[in-house]
Amino acid sequence: MNHGYRTIEFLGLTFNLTNILMITVASVIVLLIAILTTRTLSIRPGKAQNFMEWIVDFVRNIIGSTMDLKTGANFLALGVTLLMYIFVSNMLGLPFSITIGHELWWKSPTADPAITLTLAVMVVALTHYYGVKMKGLKEYSKDYLRPVPFMLPMKIIEEFANTLTLGLRLYGNIFAGEILLGLLAGLATSHYSQSVALGLVGTIGAILPMLAWQAFSLFIGAIQAFIFTMLTMVYMSHKISHDH
């Protein structure tokens, strides 16, 4: 289970090619889904358009549960993109992984803490940006001193805690799922070196647990995409609302 990653050095920085590949694959898949489901918009939508409209309505309901929809409409595209991108990213490593030599080339990008924490930092940074944009820097800064000024240290700690939990929750769930799938796959193939019969027994014994865990991982991947999107909108609501 200990695999390395192909890296390159550029301008003194180290880049993980596996992560770059999987981020690109996830982005292309989401882009293709968006294009294919919206290229022929009609008053009488087909299955593809219905699918995209369902996603948009689902995200609109998420936003509506956290803030006024008139304001929240500004974040509909963000919510749809986050939900689709994270779900697709969660699913990429579910059916299989690809290892060449001792280097892992195909996995879920969200099974890497660097990616999930980067997503979390970007989201939290966006909430601060829109907070300042919609309330003004002076009014936004006062929120950190409310209801009493000595809450400032606690609110700063809260910002770091929100960022860490948002990123690490997603990473932990997806990474754990891929680890267990890898262990079950190893169980299915580990006994062939001893005998074909023993190997077949191991394979048959591992098939049902693998199928069950893949189904559960599909559910977990969807739930984690929902939670990430929901919390993004909750954090956004806290930053732009005049009640906070």
Curated annotation (Swiss-Prot):
Keywords: ATP synthesis, Cell membrane, CF(0), Hydrogen ion transport, Ion transport, Membrane, Transmembrane, Transmembrane helix, Transport
PROSITE patterns in the cross-refs: ATPASE_A
Presence of the UniProt keyword Cell membrane in the record: yes
Transmembrane segments: 17-37, 75-95, 112-132, 170-190, 221-241
Chief place of localization: membrane
GO cellular component: plasma membrane; proton-transporting ATP synthase complex
Compartments reported by the entry: Cell membrane
Gene3D superfamilies for the chain: ATP synthase, F0 complex, subunit A
Its membrane topology: Multi-pass membrane protein
InterPro entries linked: ATP_syn_F0_a_bact/chloroplast, ATP_synth_F0_asu, ATP_synth_F0_asu_AS, F0_ATP_A_sf
GO MF terms, alphabetically ordered: proton-transporting ATP synthase activity, rotational mechanism
Any one of the GO BP annotations: proton motive force-driven plasma membrane ATP synthesis
Database matches in PANTHER family: ATP SYNTHASE SUBUNIT A, CHLOROPLASTIC
Subunit structure: F-type ATPases have 2 components, CF(1) - the catalytic core - and CF(0) - the membrane proton channel. CF(1) has five subunits: alpha(3), beta(3), gamma(1), delta(1), epsilon(1). CF(0) has three main subunits: a(1), b(2) and c(9-12). The alpha and beta chains form an alternating ring which encloses part of the gamma chain. CF(1) is attached to CF(0) by a central stalk formed by the gamma and epsilon chains, while a peripheral stalk is formed by the delta and b chains. The F(1)F(0) complex interacts with SpoIIIJ and YqjG; YqgA is found in the same complex.
Entry's family note: Belongs to the ATPase A chain family.
Listed HAMAP family: ATP_synth_a_bact
Free-text function comment from the UniProt entry: Key component of the proton channel; it plays a direct role in the translocation of protons across the membrane.
Stated name of the protein: ATP synthase subunit a
Protein species of origin: Bacillus subtilis (strain 168)
